[in-house]
Amino acid sequence: VQGKGNVEIELDGDNELKSGFNRAGLEKTDFTFIGTPSTGMLTLKDDNQKAGSLKATGGQFGAGIGGAENGNGKDITIKGGTVTATGGEFAAGIGGGFGGSGENITINGGTVTADGNDWAAGIGGGKEREGENITITGGTVNAAGGIGGGTGGNGKNITITGGTVTAKGGV
C-alpha cells in the first residue's frame, strides 16, 4: 500500500498473504530516506456480516503487516476481525521491518496476534528501531516480542485503555 490515499480492507472469509525476500506480508512502508513518504492510512476491519481473518507473514526482513526491510510501518489501524501477523527475520509482527520503526499503530477491536522475530517487537519497531504512538483500546491482543521498540530501540507513547493484552518480551 503506497501513496497518499487511505486504504480500508474489509476482511471476509479466511485470507493469507505470504511475502518474498525483503518485503512485508501486507506492506504499508514509509521509505522517507529514498523518496516521497507514504501519507495514507491502512485500516483492517470486519463488519461481522461474514467472519473475516487475515494471516500475514513477512519474508526475510519484512514485517507481517507494515514495513519492508529498512521501511517504517506506520499509520496502521485494526478495527476488527482475526489478524495474525508474523515478522520475518529481525522484523516486527505489526510495524517496522528490519531497520524500520513502527509508528501510529492503533488496535480497537478484533483478535490480534503479532509475533516479532529475532529481536523485533511483536507490535512496534524492527530490530534496533523505535516503536511509538501505539494505542490499544479494545479487542484481544497477543504480542510476542512485546509492544514498543525492538532490541536496541526505544518504545514511547504506548497507551492501553481497554481490551485484553498479553505482551511477552522475546529475543
Per-segment meaning from a language model:
Residues V1-V171:
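A composition-driven surface/loop motif
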